[in-house]
C-alpha cells in the first residue's frame, strides 16, 4: 500500500497530465476520480488550464482540498463552447452522479413552522419538523426566529380566535378555558362557534399568512363601520382589534419591505471552507421565511462558481427574480442564459441595488451568519457525543441521553426529573417531572428507583441510548436491576473529594469507578448535563413547594372556605390562573359553594391577584 507522499505524487502527476492536455483559456468541466474509479468531484472553470494548475500549489491548499487531492487517481476533461455550457454540464453531472465532495447539506430541522392541524376545528401551533404529511391542512415557514413565530401565532389567534390546545385537551373540556375568557379563542370545544364559521376564520388566517390580507382588511373595515353605524360598538371594537392585529403581523413578517412579486434573495456567508447559502423567499411580496443550505468547499472554485452551481442544483422552478450576494463584477448574464436554456423561460439574476433590495439582502446575510454559527456549534456537539461514546464504551455516538436527578427538603415536596440531550443539544420538550409518591423519608436512592421505574412504565416506547444519574454507589444499586433488565447502559456521576468541581467520579453499571481530566471537554460536557438536570429538579421542587404554600395561604384566609371546599374550587377551575378570571356565577357552580361564598372568594381573589402565580 502506498504511503501519503506517494499518493500525493501520483495525484500531482494526474493533475499535470490533465493540465497539459488542454489549451489556454478554454472553458469546460473536469471530473476527479479516486481508487476503484470512484467519482470524487466535478468542477467547471472559465479557464480549465488555470483552474487545474491551482490544485498543484500545495502551500495554498486548505485542509479539505489537500484531503481530496491526495485521493486523485485520474481526471476526465470536457471542453465546452462557453462558460454557460460548462455551468449546465456541471449541474447535470452533479445531479446525476452525486460526487462525494459536491454535497449540498440542507438544514431545516431547527427552524420553526406555523402549522394548522388536520381536525374538524384545526389548531394553530408552532412546529419544528416539516416532514409531517397527513398531519396538517396548512404549513407556513420556515421562520428563523421562534420568538417571531410565536408572536405571529399569538396575533393570528387574537385576530381570528383560533384554538391552539392539544386535541386530547379539546376533547375533554367541560367548560371554556381561560383562552376564551381573554378573547383568544372562540371555544369550539363548547360549540360557541359553528363549524362553518370556524372554517371561515381558518381560511382568513391562511390568507393573512400568505399576504392576501388586503381583502380581509377591507372586509373588516366595512364590518366595523356597519357595526358602528348600528351602534353595535362591542362588535365594532372586535373588528378594530382584528385590524390592528393584522397590521402587527404584517410588520412582524416583513410584508412592508418594498419587495414585490416572486423574488428570492441568496446570501453567502463563509467560515474557512464551509459556506452557508441562505435563501429568503418572497412570494407575492410576502416574506415567506428562509432556508439555509451548507456547502463544504473542497475544490478551488470561486464564490460565484459555488453560487451558480448551488442555484442549478436546488431549484426545480425558479422565481421571476433572484438576487445574489456577490461582488459587483459578478456576471449575471452567464447564469441567466443557463437558466433560460434549462427552464425554457426568462429568469432575472440580479445584484441588489435599491434600498429595499439591500435591506432584504442584509436580512438574508444575518440569517446566513446565524445559521452557519449554529452549525459550527452543532459540529462541536457531535464531537462531544463521539467522546462520550468512547468513554462509556458505546458502539456509536448516542442519539438520546437521559439525565436524572431528585430534589426535596427533608423529604417534603420531592420531585424527580428527566432531562434529555440529543444530537441537537438539550431537548427541552422531552423533559419530564415525576412527583415522588411512595417515598416520604427523604431516601434519595429509593426516590431514584421510583423515578426510573415509572419512567419506563409511563413512556415504554422511547428508550435512551444511555442514562446518566446524579448520584453515587447507592443510586447505582437502586436502579441496576431495572436498567439491566431493559439492557440500557448507565452511569452515575458523583462529587469527588471535598465536593470540588472538576473532581467528579463516575460509577459504571458494572461497579467500575473512573474519573476524567478536570480540564477535558468531555468532563465539561458531562458536568453541564448534570447541572441542567439539577437546575430542572430544583425549579420543579420550588414550584411545587411555593404553589402549595401559596394555595394553602390563599384559600385558608377566606372566611368559610376550608380545606375541602378549597380543593373543590381548585379542582373545578384547574388552576389559580383560571380562578382569577372566574365570575361569581361560575364560582357558585362549584359543589358546596353558595352565591354568598362565591362572591367572597371572587372579591378576595381580586384583592390578592398581585400575589398570585399562574
Curated annotation (Swiss-Prot):
Q: Name one GO biological process term.
A: nucleotide-excision repair
Under PROSITE patterns, the record lists:
GIY_YIG (PS50164), UVRC (PS50165)
Where the record annotates domain GIY-YIG, the positions are 25-103
- SUPFAM superfamilies for the chain: C-terminal UvrC-binding domain of UvrB (SSF46600), GIY-YIG endonuclease (SSF82771), RuvA domain 2-like (SSF47781)
Q: Where in the cell is it found?
A: Cytoplasm
Q: Which SMART domains match?
A: GIYc, HhH1
Give the record's GO CC terms. cytoplasm; excinuclease repair complex
Which domain of life does the protein's organism represent? Answer: Bacteria
* Broad class of where this protein is predominantly found: cytoplasm
Q: Where are the transmembrane segments?
A: none
- Per UniProt, residues of the UVR domain are 214-249
Sorted alphabetically, the keyword list is:
Cytoplasm, DNA damage, DNA excision, DNA repair, Excision nuclease, SOS response
Which GO molecular-function terms appear in the entry?
Answer: DNA binding; excinuclease ABC activity
Keyword DNA repair found: yes
Coiled-coil stretches: none
**Matches recorded under NCBIfam families:** uvrC (TIGR00194)
**Record-stated family:** Belongs to the UvrC family.
Known partners and oligomeric status: Interacts with UvrB in an incision complex.
Task performed by this protein: The UvrABC repair system catalyzes the recognition and processing of DNA lesions. UvrC both incises the 5' and 3' sides of the lesion. The N-terminal half is responsible for the 3' incision and the C-terminal half is responsible for the 5' incision.
Q: What is this protein called?
A: UvrABC system protein C
Identify the coding gene.
uvrC
Amino acid at each position: 500500500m502506498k504511503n501519503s507522499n506517494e499518493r500525493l505524487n501520483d495525484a500531482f502527476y494526474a493533475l499535470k497530465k490533465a493540465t497539459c492536455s488542454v489549451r489556454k483559456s478554454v472553458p469546460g468541466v473536469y471530473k476527479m476520480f479516486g481508487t476503484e474509479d470512484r467519482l470524487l468531484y466535478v468542477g467547471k472553470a472559465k479557464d480549465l488550464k488555470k483552474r487545474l494548475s491551482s490544485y498543484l500549489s500545495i502551500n495554498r491548499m486548505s485542509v479539505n482540498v489537500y484531503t481530496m487531492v491526495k485521493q486523485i487517481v485520474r481526471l476526465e476533461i470536457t471542453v465546452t463552447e462557453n462558460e454557460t455550457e460548462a455551468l449546465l454540464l456541471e449541474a447535470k453531472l452533479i445531479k446525476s452522479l452525486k460526487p462525494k465532495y459536491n454535497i449540498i447539506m440542507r438544514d431545516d430541522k431547527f427552524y420553526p413552522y406555523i402549522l394548522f392541524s388536520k381536525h374538524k376545528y384545526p389548531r394553530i401551533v408552532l412546529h419544528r419538523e416539516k416532514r409531517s404529511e397527513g398531519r396538517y391542512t396548512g404549513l407556513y415557514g420556515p421562520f428563523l426566529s421562534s420568538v417571531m413565530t410565536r408572536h405571529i401565532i399569538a396575533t393570528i389567534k387574537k385576530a381570528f380566535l383560533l384554538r391552539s390546545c392539544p386535541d386530547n385537551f379539546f376533547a375533554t373540556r367541560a367548560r371554556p378555558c381561560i383562552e376564551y375568557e381573554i378573547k383568544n379563542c372562540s371555544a369550539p370545544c363548547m360549540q360557541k362557534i359553528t363549524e362553518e364559521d370556524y372554517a371561515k376564520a381558518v381560511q382568513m388566517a391562511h390568507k393573512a399568512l400568505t399576504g392576501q390580507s388586503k381583502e380581509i382588511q377591507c372586509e373588516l373595515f366595512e364590518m366595523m363601520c356597519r357595526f358602528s353605524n348600528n351602534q353595535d360598538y362591542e362588535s365594532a371594537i372586535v373588528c378594530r382589534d382584528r385590524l390592528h392585529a393584522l397590521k402587527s403581523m404584517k410588520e412582524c413578517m416583513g410584508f412592508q419591505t418594498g419587495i414585490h412579486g416572486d423574488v428570492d434573495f441568496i446570501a453567502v456567508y463563509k467560515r474557512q471552507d464551509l459556506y452557508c447559502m441562505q435563501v429568503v423567499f418572497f412570494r407575492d411580496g410576502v416574506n415567506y421565511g428562509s432556508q439555509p443550505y451548507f456547502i463544504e468547499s473542497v475544490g478551488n472554485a470561486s464564490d460565484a462558481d459555488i453560487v451558480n452551481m448551488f442555484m442549478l442544483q436546488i431549484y426545480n422552478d425558479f422565481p421571476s427574480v433572484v438576487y445574489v450576494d456577490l461582488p459587483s463584477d459578478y456576471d449575471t448574464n452567464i447564469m441567466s442564459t443557463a437558466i433560460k436554456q434549462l427552464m425554457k423561460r426568462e429568469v432575472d439574476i440580479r445584484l441588489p441595488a435599491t434600498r429595499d433590495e439591500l435591506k432584504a439582502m442584509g436580512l438574508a446575510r444575518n440569517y446566513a451568519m446565524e445559521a452557519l454559527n449554529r452549525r459550527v456549534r452543532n459540529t462541536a456537539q457531535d464531537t462531544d457525543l463521539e467522546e462520550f461514546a468512547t468513554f462509556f464504551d458505546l458502539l456509536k455516538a448516542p442519539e438520546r441521553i437521559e439525565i436524572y436527578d431528585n430534589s426535596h427538603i427533608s423529604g417534603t415536596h420531592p420531585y424527580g426529573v428527566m432531562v434529555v440531550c440529543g444530537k441537537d443539544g438539550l431537548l427541552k420538550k422531552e423533559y419530564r417531572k415525576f412527583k415522588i409518591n411512595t417515598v416520604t423519608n427523604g431516601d434519595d436512592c429509593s426516590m431514584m428507583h421510583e423515578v426510573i421505574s415509572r419512567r419506563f412504565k409511563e413512556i415504554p416506547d422511547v428508550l435512551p441510548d444511555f442514562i446518566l444519574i446524579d448520584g453515587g454507589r447507592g443510586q447505582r444499586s437502586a436502579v441496576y436491576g431495572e436498567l439491566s433488565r431493559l439492557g440500557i447502559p448507565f452511569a452515575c456521576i458523583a462529587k469527588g473529594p471535598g465536593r470540588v468541581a472538576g473532581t467528579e467520579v463516575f460509577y459504571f453499571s458494572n461497579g467500575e469507578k473512573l474519573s476524567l481530566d478536570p480540564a477535558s471537554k468531555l468532563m465539561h460536557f458531562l458536568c453541564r448535563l448534570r447541572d441542567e438536570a439539577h437546575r430542572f429538579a430544583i425549579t420543579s421542587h420550588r414550584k411545587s413547594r411555593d404553589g402549595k404554600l401559596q394555595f394553602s395561604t390563599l384559600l385558608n384566609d377566606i372566611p368559610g372556605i376550608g380545606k375541602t371546599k378549597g380543593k373543590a374550587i381548585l379542582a373545578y377551575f384547574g388552576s389559580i390562573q383560571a380562578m382569577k378570571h372566574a365570575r361569581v356565577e361560575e364560582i357558585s357552580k362549584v359543589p358546596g359553594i353558595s352565591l354568598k361564598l362565591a362572591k367572597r372568594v371572587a372579591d378576595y381573589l381580586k384583592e390578592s391577584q398581585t400575589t398570585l402565580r399562574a
